[in-house]
């Protein structure tokens, strides 16, 4: 119950075998966790053990939800820095949505403290919101995610991890037009153009205005091929 992200279904499984705390959880065999809680549960266990998994984690659970989460290299207390991270997570998750030709109508955002820091207050804040219309636009999803973040951010507290979860996934082919959406067609064409650029030149060649250009560049440099530009100024900006 003291671990964020376990979920009610897995919590019941753990309670049945006498697991009641994070300490109990990390003592379970890896193969049991993977068999009963999937690879997602195993990644959570490794994280609690202090063993790093992927820097940015994208998860797709039977097309019911898509999550992008990350533990930061250092604690963050600035709202602006958190906005930059959440925006990047939204972009990554949105691209995954488009790849599987889906849209979402609900978003959840969370931020939490460092669970391994001794003598430190443990806290996490999360908020889920329903979208006024289904979308897979990076622009729309990041905008709504930032609003959720602003509602759970507590000034003066430090955060070590954050994440965004896209839920209420539906096929893009059955999109229902809403009174509240104005730029769907324009966004669809823009997202198609961005995805084409990403597929041709590599990820993060086009970024949103609220993303940090130097950080994106640093994240992607180790994966560059000789065909990629080496000029940071060539990264396109979408505002």
Regions found by a protein language model. Name each.
Residues 1-2, 196:
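Hydrophobic/aromatic side chains embedded in well-ordered alpha-helices
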Residues 2, 10-156:
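DNA-contacting surface of Y-family translesion DNA polymerases
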């Amino acid at each position: 119950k003291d671990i964020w992200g376990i979920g009610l279904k897995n919590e019941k499984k753990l309670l049945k075998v006498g697991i009641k705390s994070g300490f109990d959880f990390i003592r379970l065999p890896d193969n049991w966790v993977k068999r009963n809680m999937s690879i997602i549960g195993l990644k959570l266990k490794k994280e609690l053990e202090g063993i790093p998994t992927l820097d940015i984690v994208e998860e797709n659970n039977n097309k019911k939800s898509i999550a992008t989460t990350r533990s930061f290299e250092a604690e963050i207390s600035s709202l602006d820095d958190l906005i930059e991270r959440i925006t990047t997570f939204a972009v990554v998750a949105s691209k995954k949505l488009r790849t599987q030709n889906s849209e979402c109508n609900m978003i959840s955002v969370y931020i939490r403290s460092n669970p391994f820091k001794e003598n430190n207050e443990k806290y996490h804040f999360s908020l889920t919101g329903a979208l006024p219309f289904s979308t897979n636009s990076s622009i729309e999803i990041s905008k709504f995610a930032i609003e959720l973040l602003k509602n759970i951010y507590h000034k003066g507290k430090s955060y070590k991890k954050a994440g965004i979860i896209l839920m209420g996934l539906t096929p893009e082919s059955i999109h229902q037009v809403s009174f509240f959406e104005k730029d769907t067609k324009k966004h669809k064409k823009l997202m198609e153009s961005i995805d084409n650029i990403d597929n041709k030149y590599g990820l993060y060649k086009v970024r949103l205005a609220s993303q940090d250009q130097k950080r994106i560049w640093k994240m992607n440099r180790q994966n560059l091929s000789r065909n990629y530009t080496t000029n940071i100024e060539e990264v396109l900006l979408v505002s």
